[in-house]
């Protein structure tokens, strides 16, 4: 794949992921390939934003749809929205 396959997406963080990342999100997270496995995408995000400590406890969402199977390959387009959602507890 060439560099022209990369896409820019909106990235949102919630709860603990926001706290660890130090930002609520960004409008220009660069994904290196338009087609990518959810697990690879989550690894990219966790490595870039120091979220490795919660990597195994978060849910990745793509355009408000949970990526239930991290081995699934998804297609990302410019302007898509990704969200990192940690477990939420409360009463």
Curated annotation (Swiss-Prot):
SUPFAM superfamilies registered for this protein in UniProt: MoaD/ThiS
Protein known as: Molybdopterin synthase sulfur carrier subunit
GO CC field: cytosol; molybdopterin adenylyltransferase complex; molybdopterin synthase complex
Lineage: superkingdom: Eukaryota
Note: This protein is produced by a bicistronic gene which also produces the large subunit (MOCS2B).
Post-translational events: C-terminal thiocarboxylation occurs in 2 steps, it is first acyl-adenylated (-COAMP) via the hesA/moeB/thiF part of MOCS3, then thiocarboxylated (-COSH) via the rhodanese domain of MOCS3.
GO molecular function, one term: nucleotide binding
GO annotation (BP), single: Mo-molybdopterin cofactor biosynthetic process
Pathway(s) annotated for this protein in UniProt: Cofactor biosynthesis; molybdopterin biosynthesis
Subcellular location: Cytoplasm
Membership in a protein family: Belongs to the MoaD family. MOCS2A subfamily.
Residues recorded with modification 1-thioglycine: 91
Primary site of residence: cytoplasm
UniProt keyword terms in alphabetical order: Cytoplasm, Molybdenum cofactor biosynthesis, Nucleotide-binding, Phosphoprotein
Subunit composition and interactions: Heterotetramer; composed of 2 small (MOCS2A) and 2 large (MOCS2B) subunits.
Sites bearing Glycyl adenylate, chain numbering: 91
Function: Acts as a sulfur carrier required for molybdopterin biosynthesis. Component of the molybdopterin synthase complex that catalyzes the conversion of precursor Z into molybdopterin by mediating the incorporation of 2 sulfur atoms into precursor Z to generate a dithiolene group. In the complex, serves as sulfur donor by being thiocarboxylated (-COSH) at its C-terminus by MOCS3. After interaction with MOCS2B, the sulfur is then transferred to precursor Z to form molybdopterin.
Pfam family, one: ThiS
Organism: Anopheles gambiae (African malaria mosquito)
């Amino acid at each position: 794949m060439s560099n022209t396959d990369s896409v820019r997406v909106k990235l949102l963080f919630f709860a603990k992921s926001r706290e660890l990342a130090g930002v609520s999100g960004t409008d220009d997270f660069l994904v290196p390939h338009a087609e990518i496995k959810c697990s690879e995408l989550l690894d990219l995000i966790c490595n870039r934003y120091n979220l490795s400590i919660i990597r195994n406890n978060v849910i990745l969402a793509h355009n408000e749809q949970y990526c239930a199977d991290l081995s699934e390959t998804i297609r990302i387009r410019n302007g898509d929205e990704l969200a990192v959602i940690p477990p939420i507890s409360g009463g």
